[in-house]
Amino acid sequence: QFETGNRFTDEDAKAAYYKTISDGKISDLIPHARYDKASGLFNLDLKAKVHDQLSGGMGGFISSTSSNQICIGAHYRTVSLNSLDVDLTGQIGQSYTSGILSARFDLKTAIPMYLKMQAVASKQKFYQNETLFYSDRMPSFVTQSEQYVKLRLGLPFLTSSKAVVSVGYGSMTDKYYQSNTVDFSTNEQDRSLYDLFVASMKFDRNNLDSYMYPTAGTDCSVLGLLAYGKERFRPYDTTLQSNSTQTLSWLQLEGNIHTYLPISNKFVLGLRGKAVVSSKGLLSNYTSTIAQAPAFTPTPHSQTIFNPAFRSTQYLAAGVIPIWKIMNNLQFRNEFYLFAPFRQIYEGPNY
């Protein structure tokens, strides 16, 4: 942090500058160096512009499929050494609805760190077939609901990375049909209910120039998590399958790399890779197992569809992203991916 009268090098000033603006509380920080003839040093004057304490926003998008979405959010922040940030976000859509409440405390410690508490409730529907224009008469093939609370501790790692340790507890409910030939009008969905405790550690470095469609920078992360809990299976027709309960525990490791290499002023080549290794076993049936398996969803559209071919507890995925930058705010990009499951989940008799 900056303090009046401190002596520091230009590298110290650069590092402290980026630390000061990285938390988002200061929108602009203009340094001005004045030479002091008496001491032979420079005095550094800082002019800071602080974000408003209370802010809000609204957004959304319109799609010809079931992915229409509206997002509303509010943010409150204080500016102090032990500052507080509170976020409230809600999303409403035909296939996805969620609410998120989070509070972050920046701690006054020798090593800068933060403590973040988060409560989330969400519901996502996956449909058997996407039509050109959405019809609300089409039932969802898989519906996933979850509610959880999580506590995170974040701190710097090396020079330009961060480490986040988190613990959380939550419940999930999956509703699904175990066959795509079932008569939706006469049958109800089977249910799998989960109560889970999860502890994780993540190392992350991200300097991409855009969240949605970047053309420069690198996002690299390594995640390790340990999960423990229970699954309760509740079939619609108990004459074909009986209720069951089993204890779950598994270890999962993930590695992700997403980087962009400049080829020329107009052309950029993006590279993407992801590896997942998990000891998670089979659940009550094929549909519940594949619904809870880690999914590879590199594009916005892939996050809205349920594709069993891109789900596995262990897989390696890689892709290339050639980009033509037509102008500053206009680009033409293609994305090509390969998905290779190490441990493929095969469909068999459900009962």
Locate each region found by the language model:
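C-terminal outer-membrane beta-barrel translocator/porin domains of Gram-negative envelope proteins
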Residues: L196-M327, Q331-N350
